[in-house]
Amino acid sequence: AGGIAEMAELGPEVRKKTDKLDAVGNTTAAVAKGFAIGSAALTALALFTAFAEEVVKSPGVSSALHGSHFVLNLLEPKIIIGLFIGGTVPFLFCAFAMEAVGKAAFEMIGEVRRQFREIPGLMEGKAKPDYARCVDISTRAAIRQMIAPGLLAVITPLIVGFGFGAQALGGMLAGVTVAGVLLAIFMANAGGAWDHA
């Protein structure tokens, strides 16, 4: 609302009201991030429990069982390998996602500069920009750049599970859960601090 009021050149009293709305919106978003992280952590734990229950039912995984329970023995090398792989996946995913945002932004900047160069009267406000082209670039870039993070999330468990077995996959899921929750809390707090600095 503040940006719209600024572009529409509305009076300072309107800007005061939109600033209050902006502050409330930022606070609400910051609080909601905590709830979102908490619900994601609980969902990950529920999925890990479902995985453990399925492993118990599956034939050929007796080495991972302790009685009728699925156990992750930290002295087992495959589990350590899985933990380290799982611990790196959230960081790789975030790196791919941040790189995607940067690439999409630079594509948009290139298009905006092209329009300023090629559309006469755009700088003076006498001509309209090609909004559809900008929307098309941002949509295509968003979809194209998120292929790598999506493939990482889908392919990694398959490689670990088929390559190293159920124990390594359990270790990977545990590593992803712990590292992912901690990284989410860190990034939410850091982003909130930078946003309100």
Swiss-Prot record:
GO molecular function, one term: diphosphate hydrolysis-driven proton transmembrane transporter activity
Topological type in the membrane: Multi-pass membrane protein
A matching Pfam family: H_PPase
UniProt main location, coarse: membrane
Organism of derivation: Heliobacterium chlorum
Family: Belongs to the H(+)-translocating pyrophosphatase (TC 3.A.10) family. K(+)-stimulated subfamily.
Key word GTP-binding present: no
InterPro entries, per the entry: PPase-energised_H-pump
Transmembrane segments: 31-51, 79-99, 146-166, 168-188
GO biological process: sodium ion transport
Keywords, ordered alphabetically: Cell membrane, Ion transport, Magnesium, Membrane, Potassium, Sodium, Sodium transport, Translocase, Transmembrane, Transmembrane helix, Transport
Cofactor entry: Mg(2+)
Name the record gives this protein: Putative K(+)-stimulated pyrophosphate-energized sodium pump
GO cellular component: plasma membrane
Enzyme class: translocase
EC number(s) recorded for this UniProt protein: 7.2.3.1
Subunit structure: Homodimer.
Chemical reaction(s) catalysed: Na(+)(in) + diphosphate + H2O = Na(+)(out) + 2 phosphate + H(+)
Annotated site, Determinant of potassium dependence, chain positions: A29
UniProt activity-regulation remark: Requires K(+) for maximal activity.
Subcellular location: Cell membrane
Protein function: Sodium pump that utilizes the energy of pyrophosphate hydrolysis as the driving force for Na(+) movement across the membrane.
Keyword Transmembrane (UniProt): yes
